[in-house]
Amino acid sequence: MSVVLSLKNIKKNYGPVKALDDISFDVPKGSVFGILGPNGSGKTTLLGIVMNILKANAGNFYWNGVQGSSSEMRKQIGTLLETPNFYHYLSAEKNLKIAAAIKGRSYEEIPIVLEKVNLLQRKDSKFSTYSLGMKQRLAIASTLLGNPDILVFDEPTNGLDPAGIAEIRELMKDLNRQGKTIIMASHILDEVEKVCTHVAIIQKGVLKTVGTVQEVLNASPTDKAATLEIEVSAENITGLEEILKQLPGIISVTNTGSYLTIESAETLSSSSINKYCFEKGIVLSQLTLKKKSLEKRFLEITGGKSDR
């Protein structure tokens, strides 16, 4: 898979404070790449560096294999790093005409981008009449002028109500299906898990882990091997617990009273567990493969509290 953005040993200091400490990772083309971390972890600083708003103290970054961010390259990137300054008394269409003029884009693109964000029917409505979600969709429409291949968003759902959050998340998935590579910073675990294909977790300027969302979810707390979480139950739950502790590949067994939660190596399938128990004379009444949440994995990695 080709890479649209490659970061190599990025460092950024603010006096004695290390905002970013030796950050390196690649963003695959066609991905929705989430940069996840608590507030103050360095996410916005990192986006500012790759967009040439801030200068790193050390390290390099490459857009499509070219070092730095030239003006020509930036034309291929739609960026929303802060709330755009739309005029409340003007319509959506007129606001986008101003944005198009500033960017040197054709007015003919305006109905196209409004259609993409599902605002074409409200193009003549004043910005002041828009809901929070609609305002953010208009901001994203502005980033789509010029039909960029890459979109960069900083906390795209920040401050929105639940309806607005759902609108923006679905829009990002739609844009990705249309071939856009999306890079987004977020402190919201649920958002990254539902929207992103890849994630880099940053804490206090340090890259803790990076990979596909599924790889990060499946990795063990020690990052030595991928693990599965399975719930099992049987009439003889005490006997079940005893035999499972003897099965190679079982990492831990927790008895909740009504069922057992086991953590196992990914190589140990649920069918092999079922067969093993049957051969030991225990028939399972429940065997459920549980999906590990990104919140749980985040806490394992950072040892801290999550921002939901």
Feature-to-residue mapping (PLM):
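ABC-family P-loop ATPase nucleotide-binding domain
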Residues: 1-11, 304-308
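ABC transporter nucleotide-binding domains
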Residues: 5, 12-184, 189-203, 207-209
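A generic structural signal for secondary-structure junctions
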Residues: 64, 101-104, 217-222, 249, ...
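Short, surface-exposed acidic/glycine-rich loop or hinge patches that mediate macromolecular interfaces
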Residues: 67-68, 104, 207, 234-235, ...
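ABC transporter nucleotide-binding domain
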Residues: 170-264
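C-terminal coupling/interaction segments
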Residues: 264-308
